[in-house]
Amino acid sequence: MASYPDGQSYPGAAGQVPGPHPGGYYPGPPHGGGQYGSGFPPGGYGAPAPGGPYGYPSAGGTPSGTPGGPYGGGPPGGPYGGGPPGGPYGQAHPSPYGTQPPGPYGQGGVPPNVDPEAYSWFQSVDADHSGYISLKELKQALVNSNWSSFNDETCLMMINMFDKTKTGRIDVVGFSALWKFLQQWKNLFQQYDRDHSGSISSTELQQALSQMGYNLSPQFTQLLVSRYCTRSAIPAMQLDCFIKVCTQLQVLTEAFREKDTAVQGNIRLSFEDFVTMTASRML
């Protein structure tokens, strides 16, 4: 029997993790294998959202970040509009792409439902001017605070989440949604990086997961950090692994919640059901 004590390990109203725009970018099996589920409850990081059983966040409004809002302005100096590369969080590689290329985007301006700043970066990251962002292009565009590239697992996970065409690539609309997703995770990462080191320690991760509504032991949190941390004297987690871990926890929580039809915080599964549930959700 799998169980969450009193249902308290469900992400609660203390905060919602970033997810795709309602309507979703993973309605079916993603490119690369597996099923990424039905999506996460949309939400931001302000006041607590009304919760369902166990404080699980119910679907609400989309996070802030519409065109003309915090993303607006001219071409960004970094992938999150935070000035030129050199800051600690998720900055792009020093301009391997140069100026915005002409190509298949036309001259009609920013497409509908696409953030202007995300559109500028889409044009820069789309190195082959194909009109799509590949796994390789996405990986080349994103780095951690220690200037390491985002790992393949996280990049593939994000491609799978926002690939509407199921071809292993992201179009401009999907990239705009991914842009917002990354912006939210970067903000959350900065919030919990309390010592401003550019990485998340096991203590900081424990605090982050607790405020997201998870009731997980320090031993489990230390296991996550040791599994996904950088090789250093003091184990710590970079932005890419933070995104991967928190997103996967949310996916598995949703899988558990679907089986917990009695809303009791525990379920009984056969071994094959457990393996199937896990394998179908893991990327």
From Swiss-Prot:
GO terms for cellular component: COPII vesicle coat; Cul3-RING ubiquitin ligase complex; cytoplasm; endoplasmic reticulum. It is found in: Cytoplasm; Endoplasmic reticulum; Membrane; Cytoplasmic vesicle, COPII-coated vesicle membrane. It is a peripheral membrane protein. The keyword Metal-binding applies. Residues 31-44, 62-84 have a biased composition (Gly residues). Residues 203-283 are annotated as: Required for interaction with PDCD6. Ubiquitinated by the BCR(KLHL12) E3 ubiquitin ligase complex. InterPro entries: EF-hand-dom_pair, EF_Hand_1_Ca_BS, EF_hand_dom, Peflin/Sorcin_CaBP. GO terms for biological process: COPII vesicle coating; endoplasmic reticulum to Golgi vesicle-mediated transport; neural crest cell development; neural crest formation; positive regulation of protein monoubiquitination; response to calcium ion. This is Peflin. It comes from Rattus norvegicus (Rat). The gene is Pef1.
